[in-house]
Amino acid sequence: MNELIRKTNELLKNHGFEYAFCGGWAIDLFIGAQTRKHGDIDILAYWAERDAIIQYMQSLGFLVYEMLGGGKAHHITDVRNQIKCKRNIFCCTQDCEMVVLTETDEEGIYFIDFREVGQTKLNFIEFLFNDKDETDLLYARRHAVKLALSDAILYSGGIPYLSPEMCLLYKSTDTERKGYQSDYDNAMARMNQRQRRWLSDALTIMYPEGHKWMPL
């Protein structure tokens, strides 16, 4: 497996919180090979462990920002002072070349500009927070759409990753984004009948008027 993914997994494992790789890297972990260049590392995590993750990343020297929408982010210096209007945070080193932060008139709020340079160093991680119950992972956009945890979190060489059907459901909101269609094509070629059926049912619920990826 890719050395960057291995190092990230070593950084995150055994620190008291659950996680799984998501996004394009999760598709590659499912396939068993790198299929394209990836912009960054995306990690699925859970809301209940958000503070613990922030504090751990800060202890490693990472700067932590929560996304606000509108091209802005809030620098989290204290977990007691969060806005929590979006489900994702990003953690970067001081010298990370992947993001440019510009001060606004508001204290602790920055304009953000992500550079599509492709990540090659362990200097940036984005966490996307989700909910779960005792048995299922809940889709963030509609909790009624759920997938058994045993099916949602898979492993490749001991590295946890989000299953392809759930990854593709998240990617379905922006199919024109670079790499998303190839992720769909590559994953669909290898998904089993149960995975395809779950994705088909989920797309039908989320897009009752139809979707580019329907029917499967």
Question: What function would you assign to each model-found segment?
Answer:
Residues 1-216:
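Compositionally biased terminal segments of proteins
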